[in-house]
Amino acid sequence: MQPLTLTDLDAELTDAIAEDADKATFDRIGAHVDRLDVRPAVTLHSAALWYASQGLYVFPLTPRTKVPIKGTNGCLGATDDPDMVNKWWTGQPAANIGLATGHLVDVVDIDGAEGQRSRVKMWADNFEAIDNDALAKVCTPRPGGMHIYLPATGDGNKAGIFPGIDYRGRGGYVVAPPSVNDQGAYRFFGPVNLGGLA
């Protein structure tokens, strides 16, 4: 029987990591996620405006990349001002969304199978409360990739807190849904509780 929800697929992914599954298994799980994406299409422009309306700071990234568009000053120029967001995305409607961390949200950045193995160990050993504190979870296009949005702590970025896991805080950023790259789309799964943080 095939998994029916993203929560089921998250559990299947965790099992696959524990069993050190092959790439084909991760590709199959990713294909199931793609088939379950039945939400209405949202433009990058409207998504950037929604983030800004929640008080989150955004800035445009070069289409299909995680590189800030030249002249925007990257996360240092990030804003929640709807006029600036409109100006940026009217001029570059295919621009991906950079979401500055450290202001309202921080992000645990889990990178691929190595990060997922660390996640399983991390949750079991140290951070059982992280799932309860999560404001949102994002599947990234890389197989096994995930972002977990948490309330901001005021801490800065920390690379390699565990193998395959980085912490994005003050001075950092992540690529936000529904941005895309050559491997696929960034997507929320599970509850999204980013409203009312400001």
Where are the regions that the model predicts?
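Signature for HUH/AEP ssDNA processing cores
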Residues: 2-11, 15-18, 23-144, 153
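Histidine-centered active-site/metal-ligand motif
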Residues: 147
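DNA replication initiation modules
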Residues: 99-116, 121, 150-198
